[in-house]
Amino acid sequence: MSLTYMNMLMAFTTSLLGLLMYRSHMMSSLLCLEGMMLSLFVMVTITILNMKFTLASMMPIILLVFAACEAALGLSLLVMVSTIYGMDYVQNLNLLKC
């Protein structure tokens, strides 16, 4: 396993641990999700380039599209929650009332 794969795997696990540990604020959860998507994008791109999969060359672009949709939806939810409740604490929100 090369050094780049190890770094991206470590970045993914760090983002996953950050998502599990700092889930009290919605903004920190969104940042950790973006870090996970970025490391997945780099790992998929490097794997496709190393294995010379010509048919799977659209996979990183599709992953970026889903990451952009996730970021837009997350930011719109953050704006909605912060304007309604005045805070972005996830633990204080009751999803049945939203």
UniProtKB/Swiss-Prot annotation:
The chain crosses the membrane at residues 1-21, 29-49, 61-81. GO terms for molecular function: NADH dehydrogenase (ubiquinone) activity. It catalyses: a ubiquinone + NADH + 5 H(+)(in) = a ubiquinol + NAD(+) + 4 H(+)(out). It is found in: Mitochondrion inner membrane. It is a multi-pass membrane protein. Pfam families: Oxidored_q2. Keywords: Electron transport, Membrane, Mitochondrion, Mitochondrion inner membrane, NAD, Respiratory chain, Translocase, Transmembrane, Transmembrane helix, Transport, Ubiquinone. Signal peptide: none annotated. Gene3D superfamilies: 1.10.287.3510. GO terms for cellular component: mitochondrial inner membrane; respiratory chain complex I. InterPro entries: NADH_UbQ_OxRdtase_chain4L/K (IPR001133), NUOK/Mnh_C1-like (IPR039428). GO terms for biological process: ATP synthesis coupled electron transport. Its EC number is 7.1.1.2. Its main location: mitochondrion. Belongs to the complex I subunit 4L family. Core subunit of the mitochondrial membrane respiratory chain NADH dehydrogenase (Complex I) which catalyzes electron transfer from NADH through the respiratory chain, using ubiquinone as an electron acceptor. Part of the enzyme membrane arm which is embedded in the lipid bilayer and involved in proton translocation. Core subunit of respiratory chain NADH dehydrogenase (Complex I) which is composed of 45 different subunits. This is NADH-ubiquinone oxidoreductase chain 4L. It comes from Ectophylla alba (White bat).
